[in-house]
UniProtKB/Swiss-Prot annotation:
The EIIB domain is phosphorylated by phospho-EIIA on a cysteinyl or histidyl residue, depending on the transported sugar. Then, it transfers the phosphoryl group to the sugar substrate concomitantly with the sugar uptake processed by the EIIC domain. The modification Phosphoserine is found at residue 37. It is found in: Cytoplasm. Induction: Induced by lichenan, lichenan hydrolysate and cellobiose. Subject to carbon catabolite repression. The gene is licB. The keyword Kinase applies. Residues 1-102 form the PTS EIIB type-3 domain. This is Lichenan-specific phosphotransferase enzyme IIB component. It comes from Bacillus subtilis (strain 168).
Length: 102
């Protein structure tokens, strides 16, 4: 599964990406997880199975949902508490539910 995260500058989610990768690894799952800034999404969405937005870029949801629909990629906003506490396991679970992967 390829999980693309979007944040304001592509940097604020780097710790969350690390925590998600660790959680996936502990579960024996071979996922690719990366973060980009909002203006870079179009260059990466073709490689993604799901697209998750950081709460700080929630305002981009309508625009990115349209893009996701045109590419067959489900889009949602990361739970604010899970994002704020850097809960990689819960964000990973959300991505799997969004992408219908167990």
């Amino acid at each position: 599964m390829n999980i693309l995260l979007v944040c304001a500058a592509g940097m604020s989610t780097s710790l969350l990406v690390s925590k998600m990768e660790k959680s996936a690894q502990e579960q024996g799952k071979d996922y690719t997880i990366w973060a980009v800034s909002g203006d870079s999404v179009q260059n990466h969405i073709d490689k993604a199975d799901v697209l998750l937005l950081g709460p700080q870029v929630r305002y981009m949801l309508p625009q990115l949902k349209k893009l996701g629909e045109s590419k067959g990629v489900p889009v949602d906003v990361i739970n604010t508490v899970h994002y704020g506490t850097c809960n990689g396991a819960e964000v990973l679970k959300s991505a799997e539910q969004l992408g219908h992967v167990s």
